[in-house]
């Protein structure tokens, strides 16, 4: 079994959710909503993780959230709570989202640029990376003025650095090497 972000147990739960999801994209959107809630509201995450909080109280909370999400996901979260796995719910859902991306042949990338990318630039990057990886690309654009121009792309463990700052550093290194070699001659 493939081990994703949350470890073996989270992976098992995520694969179970994936296998019972008749409409994966609908469940995916709902899972993204729950992940957002858990990441942005630390109290809810701590509440679900706390072993001193009764299952009944946790179930009541899930029922409140259940008004906004798919019934399959609500039932799944109830099973997670009943099995005392509320402490890894975020990991389970993130692993599920990774499975959906893999199923849809998607890859998330991070693009660091000195300014916000235009729609045209994003499309160009997506097209180029689709050719390279054969997957649909979703971009997260991070702004870092220190790179001066160009961009840095991070895809899993690959880094493509075509920033002006990187280019200038390379020129500095080449200049130093040229000066050293001319002095030694």
UniProtKB/Swiss-Prot annotation:
UniProt-annotated location(s): Cell inner membrane
Membrane topology category: Peripheral membrane protein
Matches recorded under Pfam families: OSCP
Record-level Gene Ontology MF annotations: proton-transporting ATP synthase activity, rotational mechanism
Keyword Lyase appears in the UniProt entry: no
GO CC annotation, single: plasma membrane
Record-linked Gene3D superfamilies: N-terminal domain of the delta subunit of the F1F0-ATP synthase
Disulfide bond residue pairs: none
Keywords: ATP synthesis, Cell inner membrane, Cell membrane, CF(1), Hydrogen ion transport, Ion transport, Membrane, Transport
Keyword Amino-acid biosynthesis: no
Subunit structure, interactors included: F-type ATPases have 2 components, F(1) - the catalytic core - and F(0) - the membrane proton channel. F(1) has five subunits: alpha(3), beta(3), gamma(1), delta(1), epsilon(1). F(0) has three main subunits: a(1), b(2) and c(10-14). The alpha and beta chains form an alternating ring which encloses part of the gamma chain. F(1) is attached to F(0) by a central stalk formed by the gamma and epsilon chains, while a peripheral stalk is formed by the delta and b chains.
Family of the protein in this entry: Belongs to the ATPase delta chain family.
Described function: F(1)F(0) ATP synthase produces ATP from ADP in the presence of a proton or sodium gradient. F-type ATPases consist of two structural domains, F(1) containing the extramembraneous catalytic core and F(0) containing the membrane proton channel, linked together by a central stalk and a peripheral stalk. During catalysis, ATP synthesis in the catalytic domain of F(1) is coupled via a rotary mechanism of the central stalk subunits to proton translocation. This protein is part of the stalk that links CF(0) to CF(1). It either transmits conformational changes from CF(0) to CF(1) or is implicated in proton conduction.
HAMAP family: ATP_synth_delta_bact
Protein name: ATP synthase subunit delta
């Amino acid at each position: 079994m493939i081990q994703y972000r949350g470890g073996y147990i989270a992976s098992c739960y995520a694969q179970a959710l994936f296998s019972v999801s008749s409409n994966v994209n609908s469940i995916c959107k709902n899972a993204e909503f729950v992940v957002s809630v858990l990441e942005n509201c630390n109290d809810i995450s701590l509440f679900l993780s706390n072993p001193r909080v009764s299952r009944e109280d946790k179930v009541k909370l899930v029922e409140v959230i259940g008004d906004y999400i798919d019934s399959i996901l609500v039932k799944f979260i109830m099973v997670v709570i009943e099995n005392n796995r509320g402490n890894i719910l975020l990991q389970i859902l993130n692993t599920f989202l990774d499975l959906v991306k893999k199923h849809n042949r998607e890859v998330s990338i991070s693009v660091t640029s000195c300014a916000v990318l235009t729609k045209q630039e994003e499309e160009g990057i997506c097209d180029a990376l689709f050719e390279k990886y054969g997957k649909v690309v979703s971009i997260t654009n991070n702004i870092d003025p220190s790179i001066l121009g160009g961009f840095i792309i991070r895809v899993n463990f690959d880094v493509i650095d075509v920033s002006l700052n990187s280019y200038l550093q390379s020129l500095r290194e080449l200049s130093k090497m040229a000066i050293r070699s001319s002095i030694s001659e």
